[in-house]
UniProtKB/Swiss-Prot annotation:
GO terms for cellular component: cytoplasm. Catalyzes the condensation of the acetyl group of acetyl-CoA with 3-methyl-2-oxobutanoate (2-ketoisovalerate) to form 3-carboxy-3-hydroxy-4-methylpentanoate (2-isopropylmalate). This is 2-isopropylmalate synthase. Homodimer. The keyword Transferase applies. Residues 5-267 form the Pyruvate carboxyltransferase domain. Its main location: cytoplasm. It is found in: Cytoplasm. One of its GO terms (molecular function) is manganese ion binding. It comes from Ruminiclostridium cellulolyticum (strain ATCC 35319 / DSM 5812 / JCM 6584 / H10) (Clostridium cellulolyticum). CDD domains: DRE_TIM_IPMS. The lineage of its organism: Bacteria, Bacillati, Bacillota, Clostridia, Eubacteriales. Residues 390-508 are annotated as: Regulatory domain.
Amino acid sequence: MARTIKIFDTTLRDGEQTPGVNLNLQEKLEIAKQLVRLGVDVIEGGFAIASPGDFESIMTLSRNLKGVTIASLCRSVEKDIDRAWEAVQYAESPRIHTFIATSDIHMKYKLKMTEEEVLERAVSMVKRAKGYCSNVEFSAEDASRTREEFLYRVVEAVIKAGATTVNIPDTVGYSTPLEFGRLIRNIRNNVPNIDKADISVHCHNDLGLAVANSLAAVENGAVQVECTINGLGERAGNAALEEIIMGINTRKDYYDITHRIDTTQIYRASRLVSSLTGVNVQPNKAIVGANAFAHESGIHQHGVLSEKTTYEIMTPESVGMGTNRMVLGKLSGRHAFEDRLKEMGYSLSDEEVKTAFAKFKDLADKKKVVTDKDIEALVDENIAVPEIFVIDSFQINSGNKMISTSTVSVRKDEEIITEAATGDGPVDAAFNAVERATGVNAELVHYRIKAVTEGKDALGEVTVKISNNNSIFMGKGVSTDIIEASVKAYLNAINRSISEIGESIISQ
């Protein structure tokens, strides 16, 4: 009989630690809703004590999501565990996830604790967590570099103290598949009470082995896999959820394992996370990359045309990457538009639908065909970013033998503010004018433009990242006019920075 594994998604916690990623509350909620549709078993919403924002997002997920376990990470420290419980207590299925490092190098240089002190701390904090919550996960940080006999003792002791899941992380992506699989097997064989808890794994990708190590662990008895959408995470990232799941699905003959994931929701989850984090998916990324199902070689093309399975071991449709459906145009009504949004996985408020529909009608006047990708770009552009400043109008004068100038008018409440500026090209001039009009000085650290669809009337999507007050803020803008898309993106990022930091950053 096939074993069933659990998928623990940490996109909103470990994934958000990707450099330059800073999700707000509404964006986290949108991603979490998609993760529920995807069918993950556990969502780690954040690190409750790390910041008020993390605490609020975990509590919001706990109050709003059903059919999924909500977890908060916490150190093996009393105040951390107390705060984690405050955040997850309203969840239908709450989990406290506590950790402490167990490797010699971490104990000596980071914790400055002995093995016995670490063991005692781990046990006492699991007991404290268990006093709040029946579902407690314990992680032995840097387990793959921990002395195995000590690791067995820690795992046995925390299970006895009440841990229902024990996580074995490859924290620095140091292990190899054979080695990591053997470690999981050794834990099963050397921890007497291991049958009273689920074995979980959390693999990092520093050597490009996170997915391979995770699958090796599953093969050797791991019950839960911790992963992120698109493999997001600090340094080289985490094991990619989509690669683990499709590896298991494609090789059912080998793994004989089941799970709850609806694979047709994978591509939508990947695009949503990419859009809201501003982290592009590489074209040759397995499963969800733009080239994942592309065939350029003549021999390969001939084979696929004759019989798809000659070169395709899975179908685009199996991960929700079907052909674009060209179903809406300028004569489409709001009802049809709203139905299409629901089919695409969006759950928007009436006001958000109204705003998105207005943008859709405006785009439909400029484009012959509006595709699903266009709609995604329109909706994702302004998810949950308060419009403190709104573009009223802009004008550009630019050429190869003149200084580029821009005049931008923005609206704040009922006031229209107009400013002009010069710059090195039309985009720079427009950004300088936006800064003068808003009174916010920022440093542009990233600018990217891409065509959402094909053709001369394609929608252009601009992503910018600005640095303000030692934080990075992302903005997105879409338009058939790339200058307008750029202005929208820059203003979007400025609005986000004001929302996060406060209006004190606006110079008078």
